[in-house]
Regions:
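Short Lys/Arg-enriched alpha/beta "domain-start" segment
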Residues: 1-40
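Core AdoMet radical
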Residues: 113-129, 133-160, 166-185, 189-227, ...
Length: 258
């Protein structure tokens, strides 16, 4: 509450805050969700430092990252930095479009909180903003993602962004995107510098998926399977290929069968 009152705290993804430990580890911890009140962990301010406690017992002094004030800067062609990027934890997310294709057609995922951005998507502005963060801000890796795009546009933008990043830095690039119907596209992703990739199935039960995710739920599980198998061929099976799932959205039997 102390940092929030000062307007300094930097929000993490999905109603969370990044806790910074003295050994350099950063933990992304939800705190604006209903389940947060059940946590045995709490953070106190003793007038000087922020203290992490477990069942009211001292664990460690921690710190937070401050607000990314660069979000309000404007690129040469009028794009606000915060509409293209999101700096949190150890990464810089770069959006590959401003608006989720499914949300634009009233088929967005009902659990998603990604909001559409104003203006036109301009790759030259995106590259300018990437340059700024590379030259002025410390972070470990890139994430290309945020919302779903129309297949060809999404794929072309991902390749353009990845290629630009790779020409200017060796930082790892993680892409979170839809599974391409043409899996050969994944070879182009890798050639353009992507190191990790994720196709998020979220819900196995396709009937429930189509209700909860009207657009994305229409993608057959076989398309995910084909993309994931091809990705493992390209990036290996040691953690560079993944898929996120939402536990509790379908019967546990369907979840385990998936």
């Amino acid at each position: 509450q102390n940092m929030k009152n000062k307007g300094m705290i930097r929000q993490g993804v999905f109603q969370s805050v990044d806790l910074k430990f003295n050994n350099g580890i950063v933990i992304n911890a939800p705190y604006l969700t209903d389940f947060s009140v059940m946590s045995p962990f709490e953070i106190d301010f003793n007038g000087k430092n922020y203290i992490l406690k477990y069942y009211n017992r001292y664990l460690e002094t921690i710190s937070f990252d401050t607000l990314d004030t660069n979000r309000n800067k404007i690129a040469s062609n009028g794009t606000m930095y915060g509409n293209v990027t999101f700096l949190a934890t150890d990464r810089l997310r770069v959006h590959h479009q401003f608006r989720c294709y499914f949300k634009m057609h009233d088929q967005g995922c009902k659990f998603c909180n990604v909001k559409p951005k104003e203006g036109n998507y301009d790759l030259s502005d995106v590259f300018e903003i990437i340059d700024f963060y590379l030259n002025n801000v410390d972070f470990r890796h890139f994430l290309i993602g945020g919302g779903s795009g129309k297949a060809e546009i999404e794929q072309n933008n991902i390749m353009a962004i990845a290629s630009y990043i790779r020409k200017h830095t060796k930082k790892p690039i993680y892409a979170m995107c839809l599974p391409p119907e043409n899996i050969e596209v994944l070879e182009e992703y890798k050639k353009n510098g992507i190191n990790e990739i994720s196709f998020n199935i979220e819900i196995f039960n396709r009937k429930i998926a189509r209700t909860t995710m009207p657009g994305k739920g229409k993608i057959p599980l076989k398309q995910y399977e084909n993309a994931l198998k091809k990705a493992v061929e390209l990036w290996g099976s040691s953690g560079n290929v993944r898929s996120m799932l939402v536990l509790g959205m379908e019967p546990i039997e369907d979840f385990l069968d998936g």
